């Protein structure tokens, strides 16, 4: 789980691994993980991002449907019937108001159905401000790893491998 602004679990996992290879591991005020391999030469920065796209609950209507806003770039038409998972494990499916022509979809026409009978029931599971990520299976097929957010996390893995391989260096290296 690691939508933009809520990457704590991802950051902690990366920091635990990076600590074996790096001199300093810190987090700045914005939540960036900064891993430093000390050197006396030039400062060199290697960067990757650990967040993922998702949604944030903005309103719960009287029917218990959760209205949401996007976190990152989303294509509205691709969201229909997609499963999302909130940090507390609650799952829901994105749907849209039946009267809306598909070509006219906006976030205002979409909602997350968690199976709640009404607003009070929904609020027992999800609060306004809760983040959710898109849930899809991870699997290996024909020697290839498939799954969501790999485009985001492969950069982190690459930086971890670089930290592991770098050894001693004259330059001051920053992995962010």
Protein language model features and the residues they cover:
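N-terminal hydrophobic/helix-forming segments and targeting peptides
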Residues: 2-176
């Amino acid at each position: 789980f690691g939508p933009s602004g809520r990457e704590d679990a991802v950051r902690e996992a990366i920091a635990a691994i990076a600590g074996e290879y790096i001199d300093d591991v810190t987090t700045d005020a914005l939540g960036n993980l900064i891993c430093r391999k000390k050197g006396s030469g030039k400062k060199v920065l290697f960067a990757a991002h650990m967040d993922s796209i998702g949604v944030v609950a903005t309103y719960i209507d009287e029917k218990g449907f959760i209205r949401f806003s996007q976190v990152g770039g989303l294509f509205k038409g691709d969201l229909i019937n997609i499963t999302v998972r909130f940090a507390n494990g609650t799952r829901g499916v994105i749907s849209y108001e039946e009267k809306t022509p598909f070509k006219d979809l906006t976030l205002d026409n979409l909602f997350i159905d968690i199976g709640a009978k009404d607003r009070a029931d929904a609020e027992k599971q999800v609060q306004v401000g809760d983040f959710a990520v898109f849930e899809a299976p991870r699997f290996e097929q024909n020697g290839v790893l498939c799954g969501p957010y790999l485009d985001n996390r492969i950069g982190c893995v690459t930086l971890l491998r670089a930290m592991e391989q770098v050894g001693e260096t004259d330059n001051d290296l920053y992995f962010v």
